[in-house]
From Swiss-Prot:
Residues 242-554 form the SAM-dependent MTase PRMT-type domain. This is Probable protein arginine N-methyltransferase 3. It comes from Arabidopsis thaliana. Belongs to the class I-like SAM-binding methyltransferase superfamily. Protein arginine N-methyltransferase family. It is an enzyme of class 2 (transferase). The active site is at residues 365, 374. Its EC number is 2.1.1.319. One of its GO terms (molecular function) is protein-arginine omega-N monomethyltransferase activity. It is found in: Cytoplasm, Cytosol. The lineage of its organism: Eukaryota, Viridiplantae, Streptophyta, Embryophyta, Tracheophyta. The gene is PRMT3.
């Protein structure tokens, strides 16, 4: 195999070019003025929709009326051939989408006006834009993102670009920290090398740049104009979301619901009480203790010290009172083993004395809807890396996501088709349109699944890195063989299992499952509805079928559905974004792609 060599070169703008750019400028200056055009020319009145044809250069503040003109300008003025790069690197739509956002972010941070890439071999190379965060528009009004592939006929993935952009814009703001802008430099000949894992390193800051204020962040807001604001505002917004999040757990109703969830509570109880070798005499940390039920189990199991961490002030007081009532609380007046710390785990040092890497067992019920909603896993991983001993136990220690296709019975359509003898299906159709953008959390009956379940993603909580919380995975759905007939797949359902495996729970490993095949839990399942149902049938039904109709129709059912699913933490703190791509495969190997859908939970 040819040796891989990548040259990733930054070219600074010349002194002549520098004169053309104001040192006082910022990302907001890169937007067109109120008239939307350059050179002070007056704009003719129109229907107010010119923003869709206003394309901003990737490297400077020039505006163009078409992508072709923009990319030609980038090639001639900045040495960047976008179409050539796509062809050379074989970038699909999503990789190209990420590349544009990556360049925007680097230019905003580094003010580099030219960029060159050369390579002998790109096989197995991971480029710096190959991260899920670059699926979020860096600039919310970026028309280029849904227009750059308009003229390409061989694009493998088909989609409604306008609809995709509308959905992507719902992902919200994106903040860029420019505190270090201009602090580091590199020469024009500096090259990015490939390390042992074949990762291409990120762009370094260019030299000769004006230092920006350390308190400034560039924030793309919901308004038409980007704003430059104090960086502390972002932290305040995060704190506000955290306060609302932890405050929501101050209601006793949600705790009753969780405690009444026997599948959930008994799985944790069995893991803590039926593994004496693990718990007896150990130091235990419970992240997000709520009422303290898991900490009480740990104390009962013989732990020598239990640190219960709770960020909700009210619930920290409740957990303290419960621990005292059950005679396990530990302070100057009580001789128990359980301590309650009112704190976020990231700030635990301020609330309690505990040495780093001194915890034997880290336990937490961190899972949210679709496993990752609420983004609490990041806090658990922080606690693992900060407090857990090397080789210490984390409970649960595995998490696995599954996916399957569901039929019409899992939707509300049948209800609205016959309401006391009246046809109200128009309501059902309107609800259906909403569910193609918003996930539904509900219990799916096993009988309503029309495909076999399949594995989507696995997490090893003992070893995973925090950035692996965001992921992209593929799966193939096969129609169920139990009913040898054609059925409509209206969407996919996601669920998860968490495992207390024999790695740590040697005496009594157990599994907490939220599957449609097991008793329901308060997590239910997460439902993602297709924009249009896909007809599927098992191979036995399709044998000899040589129809020419579109794949996935009732006349030509798909033999399987290939999925590409991405889950990433959203801009809105503690929310997640889910992108879903579906491809129907015929028994003859033909394919049909459906538009990508983006959901926010």
């Amino acid at each position: 195999m040819a040796a891989t060599m990548v040259k990733h070169e930054i070219l600074n703008y010349s002194e002549d070019e520098e004169e053309n750019y104001s040192d006082e400028g910022d990302w907001g200056d890169w937007k067109a003025d109120d008239n939307g055009i350059e050179g002070g020319e007056e704009e003719e009145e129109d229907d107010g929709d010119d923003s869709e044809s206003d394309f901003l250069c990737l490297f400077c503040d020039s505006h163009f009326v078409s992508c072709d003109l923009l990319f030609e300008h980038c090639r001639l003025s900045h040495g960047f051939d976008f179409h050539g790069v796509r062809k050379e690197l074989k970038l699909d739509f999503y990789s190209s989408f990420k590349l544009i956002n990556y360049i925007r972010s680097q230019v905003a941070e580094n003010m580099c006006f030219s960029w060159k890439i050369e390579a002998d071999d790109y096989k197995d190379v991971k480029f710096p834009w190959d991260e899920e965060k670059y699926l979020k528009p860096f600039w919310q009004e970026d028309s280029l993102l849904y227009s750059f592939a308009d003229d390409e006929e061989d694009e493998e993935v088909t989609f409604d670009r306008e609809e995709v952009m509308e959905e992507l814009q719902k992902l919200g703001d994106l903040s860029i920290d420019v505190e270090a802008l201009g602090e580091s430099s590199m020469s024009n000949s500096d090259k990015c090398n490939i390390n042992g894992s074949k990762d291409v390193t990120s762009l370094s800051n260019c030299n000769g740049l004006k230092q920006s204020s350390a308190d400034d962040l560039i924030v793309n807001g919901k308004d038409a104009e980007p704003k430059v604001c104090d960086g502390r505002l972002v932290n305040r917004n995060i704190r506000k979301v955290n306060e609302n999040y932890f405050g929501s757990y101050s209601s006793f109703g949600i705790h009753r619901e969780m405690l009444s969830d026997k599948v959930r509570t008994e799985a944790y109880r069995d893991a803590l009480l039926k593994n004496p070798t693990l718990l007896n005499g150990s130091v235990v940390m419970d992240v997000g203790c709520g009422t303290g039920i898991l900490s009480l189990f740990a104390a009962k199991a013989g732990a020598s010290r239990v640190v219960a961490v709770e960020a909700s002030e009210k619930m920290a007081k409740v957990a303290t009172k419960i621990a005292k009532d059950n005679k396990v609380f530990n302070d100057n007046e009580h001789n128990g083993v359980l301590e309650v710390a009112h704190s976020m785990v990231e700030e635990l040092d301020k609330s309690i004395q505990i040495q780093p890497h001194s915890v034997d067992v880290l336990v937490s019920e961190w899972m949210g809807y679709c496993l990752l909603y609420e983004s609490m896993l990041s806090s658990v991983l922080y606690a693992r890396d900060r407090w857990l001993k090397p080789g210490g136990a984390i409970l649960p220690d595995t998490a696995t996501m599954f996916v399957a296709g569901f039929g019409k019975g899992a939707t509300s359509l049948p209800f609205w088709e016959d309401v006391y003898g009246f046809d109200m299906s128009s309501i059902g159709k309107e609800i259906h349109d909403d569910t193609t953008r918003l996930p539904i959390v509900d219990v799916i009956a096993e009988r309503d699944l029309v495909t076999q379940p399949t594995l989507l993603q696995t997490f090893d909580l003992a070893t995973m890195k925090p950035d692996e919380v965001d992921f992209t995975a593929t799966a193939t759905l096969e129609p169920t063989e139990s009913e040898a007939k054609t059925r409509l797949c209206h969407g996919v359902v996601l669920w998860f299992d968490t495992g207390f495996t024999s790695r740590f729970c040697k005496e009594n490993p157990t599994v907490l499952s939220t599957s449609p095949y097991t008793p329901p839990t308060h997590w239910a399942q997460t439902i993602l509805t297709f924009q249009e149902p896909i007809s599927v049938a098992p191979a036995s039904v399709l044998s000899g079928n040589d129809r020419r109709e579109a794949i996935g129709t009732e006349e030509c059912p798909a033999s399987s559905i290939h999925l590409r699913v991405s889950v990433a933490r959203a801009h809105e703190h503690r929310s997640i974004d889910i992108s879903l791509e579906a491809t129907g495969l015929s028994s003859k190997g033909q394919k049909r792609h459906w538009p990508v859908q983006i959901f926010n939970l």
